[in-house]
């Protein structure tokens, strides 16, 4: 409904892609959305800044990404891939997943719950695509401002709970 009342690009959270990434992408394109992000958690997902998350295996996520990319009809529709690996597997496995997700066709990477500037920087050093940062006031990431994230090479930042505090 948001995309019906604005000309601004609208990106939505597609959780784990629902039952079919192909159907999800097709539906979102038909509704006029600019993109979506899908994540590598199991279907019974949790907030990215909570503990006890479970991930699907990297190869399964790669298949979801390829399915999403192949089903996309509008080359400008952004396929953003979120990884929750940092708090589950650590930064090295996160970087490994990011490389695989980019190779599968992700347009933008959303590395969830990076602890500090060093981790954000490590992601930027290995990533070849656009990057999204999530700055939630009550999360695991150190709060960085737009300029700090821009200087770290991040292209988009979201503040998901800020408006709830106003």
What is each of the regions a protein language model found here?
Residues 1-159, 165:
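Alpha/beta enzyme core
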